[in-house]
A protein has these predicted regions:
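Acidic/aromatic-lined carbohydrate-recognition and catalytic surfaces
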Residues: 112-114, 141-157, 245-259
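Bacterial Sec-dependent N-terminal signal peptides
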Residues: 1-4, 10-11, 15-51
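Carboxylate/His-rich catalytic cores and anion/metal-binding grooves
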Residues: 261-281
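Short coil/linker segments at helix-helix boundaries
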Residues: 236-268, 304-307, 325-344
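Solenoid-like repeat scaffolds
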Residues: 414-420
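C-terminal transactivation domains of fungal Zn(2)-Cys(6)
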Residues: 322-381, 395, 435, 439-441
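Proline-centered turn/helix-capping motifs that create local helix->coil transitions or kinks
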Residues: 277-286, 357-367, 402, 463-467
Length: 616
């Protein structure tokens, strides 16, 4: 047996090798079959993802002396429609069909944010005014657009007028609201104290009055934190461009008569915010809310009980900042609004003291719901970091009062890493206000910090825009596309305008204008994202009045959220990549809702450009 062992081992080895070779062959064949199957699936996926080649441009139009960019966009790999060879484009006057300009499309660019390829049509040299189309030989033609002075006047006015349509607790009259008139809803004069909000003389179930203010978004609740960033942005627009806004009319109720329309609108929400402060201790309730969202009905059909809920550091500091800024602005109108500025400042300083006593009071709705009834299921706005709100509030209070205590807080916090403004990130609003109003009162090193940081961010934006397939700052990085992405575009534009005001460098103003072009149609979806504007704009926003009023057109001037690959609403999206994940559906609160904190930066951006591009 021992002598036969080698023969047995050799035979076994041959068999094992044969099995191994066959197995390897089988595995390779299986891998190739799988690979082929994947290629077929990928090809089918691409066909499913195919987007018809189109010309994406600012559907509202262009200023005569400003850059004018349009983008031909189509699916990568498309050989049927997308122009691949050297191709001309033509600008055709709409009323005569005359060609007034021609040029060559730029080279093919591949988007880092989707499956799209693009070619750029640059017609900045065309300064003739009128209505035009762009035509690309053998491909496509654009929507009609205009070249004219004040081309974004309607964008500017409509975006501000949108806040009037969001007013709670009052009827919107036909004289001001047109066909979008409606009855009053949510009087909010009998609001219950939620068990989470009990303090002093305000017991659970006791009643306070907190009428007015703006509905926050597509729902009918009112949130201090989101009002904070919205109000700060609008107040800053007025401070930066006072003489422009003094003469801007939006057809809203006229009282107080001598106060500019933007401040009348701000005042409607300011009075509500002030009513959200506990007069006993200075803390501010997070929101005035139902326990659960109202259904898709008009405001006057809503009769659920309403509550104010737990106070929080973020809400309190937001009021401190807004009220301090409002104090100095409304003190310009002491005759029309006697005592308002003083009331705002008292509220602001009282809020600051509460936030000093409770520096880390987080509004954690999930935790709150484990302890108190009724459970609150509306938007949380649960910020957990407060250095940005504290810096913003300190900046506004220092500018308004000059007091050293706020000066010290600025010194402590000025080096914090503040991000692009949003409801949870307000620090840069302090930078903007200090550069606008506080420059003489801060040190040289603090000025350098503010200026250097803002310019560094702006320069990065401009650099990234040159690599973007649509040549806009928006979309320079994938992270630009999230919930409320269009507000990122508008807030990037504001930052660029702030740096332009510091430096007078034209490239920053051009970058801001490019982001307004993005919002108005120079983007991968081809939509102008503002209701009632352009040739292709949202018809089905997640916005209760627009859904329930029986009118085909949505309430105008509202900025839709924009592409959001998170798709948290689980609605139908035709495309799913960062810059294409948008659904014009009232189901889609993740991409097609509206919100006051998205409209506010649009107001700033559109109106600033109307002023700066027209040498107002």
């Amino acid at each position: 047996m021992i002598t036969d062992q080698p023969k047995f081992t050799e035979a076994k080895s041959i068999v094992l090798k044969t099995i191994f070779v066959f197995t390897e062959f089988y595995c390779q064949m299986k891998w190739h079959l799988i690979h082929l199957s994947c290629l077929i699936c990928f090809s089918q996926w691409l066909q499913g993802q195919a987007m018809k080649t189109k010309i994406c441009l600012d559907q509202e139009g262009y200023y005569p002396k400003a850059p004018k960019i349009a983008v031909v966009a189509g699916s990568s790999g498309d050989t049927s429609e997308f122009p691949r060879d050297k191709t001309s484009f033509y600008i055709i006057r709409e009323n005569t069909s005359d060609t007034v300009f021609s040029g060559e499309l730029g080279g093919i660019r591949f988007s880092a944010n989707s499956f799209l390829q693009t070619r750029v049509a640059d017609f900045s040299a065309l300064e003739s005014t009128g209505s035009f189309r762009i035509a690309v030989k053998g491909c496509c033609h654009s929507y009609i657009f205009r070249i004219q002075e004040k081309v974004h006047r309607y964008t500017a006015v409509a975006s501000l007028k949108a806040f009037y349509y969001q007013r709670a607790s009052m009827a919107l009259e036909p004289e001001y609201a047109g066909k979008w008139n409606r009855r009053a809803g949510h009087p909010d004069d009998s609001i219950l104290i939620h068990p989470s909000a009990v303090s002093g003389n305000r017991k659970s179930g006791s009643v306070i009055s907190t009428p007015g203010g703006w509905y926050d978004a597509g729902d009918y609740n009112k949130y201090v934190v989101n009002s904070g960033i919205s109000m700060g942005t609008l107040l800053s627009a007025y401070e930066d461009f006072k003489f422009y806004f003094d003469t801007l009319h939006t057809n809203i109720p006229t009282q107080p008569k001598q106060v500019p329309d933007i401040l009348k609108e701000i005042l409607y929400n300011l009075r509500w915010m002030l009513s959200m402060q506990d007069p006993e201790d200075g803390g501010v309730y997070n929101k005035c809310t139902n326990a659960a969202f109202d259904p898709m009905v008009m405001p006057d059909a809503c009769h659920q009980p309403r509550w104010v809920v737990q106070k929080g550091t973020a809400a309190t500091l937001d009021l401190a900042a807004v009220a301090a800024q409002a104090a100095r602005i409304f003190n310009l109108y002491k005759t029309e609004l006697p005592g308002l500025g003083d009331s705002c400042l008292r509220a602001s300083e009282k809020a600051w003291l509460w936030a000093q006593q409770y520096p880390e009071m987080v509004y954690d709705q999930n935790s709150m719901n484990q302890s108190y009834e009724p459970r609150i299921l509306t938007g949380g706005y649960g910020d957990k970091k407060f250095s940005d709100e504290r810096f913003w509030a300190a900046s506004e209070l220092f500018i308004t009062t000059g007091k050293q205590t706020y000066r010290e807080a600025i010194k402590t916090l000025i080096d914090e890493p503040f991000g692009l403004p949003s409801w949870s990130e307000t620090g840069l609003l302090g930078y903007y206000s200090l550069s606008r109003k506080g420059w003489p009162s801060i040190s040289g090193s603090e000025k350098d910090t503010i200026k250097t940081r803002l310019i560094r961010v702006a320069d990065k934006y401009i650099l990234e825009s040159r690599k973007n397939a649509f040549l806009t700052v928006m979309g320079g990085r994938k992270s630009d596309f999230n919930w409320g992405s269009n507000a990122n575009a508008a807030n990037q534009g504001i930052l660029l305008i702030q740096v332009y005001l510091m430096t007078k460098n034209q490239r920053y103003l051009d970058g801001a204008l490019g982001n307004l072009d993005y919002i108005c149609g120079r983007n991968a979806t081809g939509y102008c994202f503002i209701t009632g504007l352009g040739s292709l704009s949202p018809l089905h926003p997640h916005h209760r009045p627009s859904v329930a009023d029986g009118i085909t057109e949505p309430v105008p001037g509202l900025l839709a959220g924009g592409p959001n690959p998170g798709e948290q609403d689980h609605c139908h999206y035709e495309f799913h990549e960062p810059e294409t994940a948008y659904s014009d559906s009232d189901c889609s609160y993740a991409s097609n809702e509206i919100a006051i904190n998205w409209n506010a930066p649009l107001v700033y951006l559109a109106n600033a450009l109307e002023l700066l591009e027209n040498n107002f």
